[in-house]
Swiss-Prot record:
This is Extended FMRFamide-3. The modification Leucine amide is found at residue 9. Keywords: Amidation, Neuropeptide, Secreted. It comes from Karoophasma botterkloofense. Belongs to the FARP (FMRF amide related peptide) family. It is found in: Secreted. One of its GO terms (cellular component) is extracellular region. Its main location: secreted. FMRFamides and FMRFamide-like peptides are neuropeptides. GO terms for biological process: neuropeptide signaling pathway. It comes from the Eukaryota.
Amino acid sequence: GPDSTFLRL
């Protein structure tokens, strides 16, 4: 989900 993309930062 969108949070997963944020964690990749």
